[in-house]
Amino acid sequence: MPDLKRAIGLMSGTSMDGIDIALLATDGENWIERRASASMDYSDGFRARLKAGLVDARAIKDRAERPGLLRQLEHDLTLLHAVAVHDFLHEQGLQPHQIDVIGFHGQTVLHRPNESLTVQIGDGALLARETGIPVVYDMRAEDMRHGGQGAPLIPAYHAALAANLPLGLKGPVVFVNIGGISNLTYVGEDGALIAYDSGPGNMLIDQWMELHGHGRFDPGGATAMSGSVDRNTAHRYLEHEFFKGNHRRSLDRGDFAIPAKGELNLADGARTLAFVSAAAILKSASHLPARPRTYVVSGGGRKNGALMDELTALAEREGAHVIDADNAGFDGDAMEAEAWAYLAVRSLCGLPLTYPSTTGCDKPVSGGVPVRP
């Protein structure tokens, strides 16, 4: 058996709803033993502070800057992650010395790939001190220094998972993660690896529900299921410059905006935005070298019934099959956190986190900043 490291991955995504935690044992290459996972929701108050921090982040010109609320927010965010780790270890009956490394994503507050600028708040050194566990953080920056988009980083993990797909799933396979922003990873039958952000995921739907005072998201897609797609609005989204041309890029929260209040009713708006999220995946997949036969879907968006219905219908028109990651033997909620654990081990081993075909970097690039308690 190869030398395995126990790693915890911590992910706080663009939906800003909480922290996903996952434990795995891996050699950073092909051997992956997926263990436990959990999540910790942010309070409404802290979520509001994060959203306010996004406004302050617009002033950042250098990635070390922390204007306005961001310095204190970074400190408090890190302490919440430390609490999440302590609680998780207690639940699993583990001690800090039994964990080799934490992969710490932090919270993205600004992502401008065209300016080679990406900012994830989160103090890796503080997290290491608070948990007593070595930490690898800031994993996107090195990719940008080599001309990459800084995202997506999960494809290296998807490639390892692709080697263990259930029998009967036909390739080429695309792993789709539907978070606030959706991204896809194409694994060709020849092992080719291609990845990029595919468009808005839950982000617009969540914002639409909040705009109307109906909570933070559309549980199960129930609101969308009672509405109809407004084709003119959907067409406007899908004609966005992001989808044009062959050059793929990563997205920031500000690249797409919700319709004005009153432009659509609540249900039709939710259904239209669910359709847009699904259609964006298929539209982005049209840039791949071969049409996918299977889409393996993870992330919170797979729990939106309307979005999944639209995605399934669109994929079936192209002869493709859509499957929930849970039904493919994976954990659709924990996959990103698992990826961050896996990437932390790869970082410690000096292995690439990104490739020219996944982020546009000029060569395979490792990355991450390691810190000890």
Swiss-Prot record:
Keywords: ATP-binding, Carbohydrate metabolism, Kinase, Nucleotide-binding, Transferase
Gene name linked to the record: anmK
Source species of the chain: Brucella suis (strain ATCC 23445 / NCTC 10510)
UniProt keyword annotation of ATP-binding present: yes
Signal peptide: none
SUPFAM superfamilies from the UniProt entry: Actin-like ATPase domain
EC primary class: transferase
Its biological purpose: Catalyzes the specific phosphorylation of 1,6-anhydro-N-acetylmuramic acid (anhMurNAc) with the simultaneous cleavage of the 1,6-anhydro ring, generating MurNAc-6-P. Is required for the utilization of anhMurNAc either imported from the medium or derived from its own cell wall murein, and thus plays a role in cell wall recycling.
Name by which UniProt lists this protein: Anhydro-N-acetylmuramic acid kinase
